[in-house]
Amino acid sequence: MSSAPNASALMKIGQLKKPYGIKGWLWVFSETDDRTAIFDIKPWWMKTATGMKPLTVKAWRQQGTGVVAQFEQIPDRNVAETMNGVTLWVEQDILPEPAEDEYYWSDLVTLRVINEQDEYLGDITEMFETGAHAIMRVAATSDSLDKEERLIPWHKQTVVKVDLTEKTVLVAWPSDY
């Protein structure tokens, strides 16, 4: 068994949800664009109360609009019921480089968000999916324009420019919206 990786070298790729059936299968929420691409990335690590533990996919399939999976470490429904909410991680260095104008969400979290009026709105604290598109949660900081938290869509009409070197995202988003 391999030793647990350094937490700072990990990227969250999904989360285990409620059990499916009686044989230890679980619904899997994938944070990858293609929901099934998560199964092409190995090895997985799960974050537990006692630290990072390996998690090995035994089988998976699409089920309705979601995805379910069975794992070596989860033998039955009783164990599966304790896994709801467990987050799934992979080592960042095994992931392919993103294409031009594509980003891993983990690379966007902590970036400064500035609008076209050159107003600093805050820092990205979270990226999440709504179904229609991704959303940036932008939290105020001590030196941002105001103390407002903003939910800004990650969309080509909203995101003007991303500069990972400068750690900024330029958005077409007025401060009073």
From Swiss-Prot:
Pfam families: PRC_RimM, RimM. Transmembrane segments: none annotated. The keyword GTP-binding does not apply. It is found in: Cytoplasm. Keywords: Chaperone, Cytoplasm, Ribosome biogenesis, rRNA processing. SUPFAM superfamilies: PRC-barrel domain, Translation proteins. It comes from the Bacteria. One of its GO terms (molecular function) is ribosome binding. InterPro entries: PRC_barrel-like_sf, PRC_RimM, RimM, RimM_N, RimM_N_sf, Transl_B-barrel_sf. One of its GO terms (cellular component) is cytoplasm. Residues 100-177 form the PRC barrel domain. GO terms for biological process: ribosomal small subunit biogenesis; rRNA processing. HAMAP family: Ribosome_mat_RimM. Binds ribosomal protein uS19. An accessory protein needed during the final step in the assembly of 30S ribosomal subunit, possibly for assembly of the head region. Essential for efficient processing of 16S rRNA. May be needed both before and after RbfA during the maturation of 16S rRNA. It has affinity for free ribosomal 30S subunits but not for 70S ribosomes. Belongs to the RimM family. The PRC barrel domain binds ribosomal protein uS19. This is Ribosome maturation factor RimM. It comes from Psychrobacter arcticus (strain DSM 17307 / VKM B-2377 / 273-4). The gene is rimM.
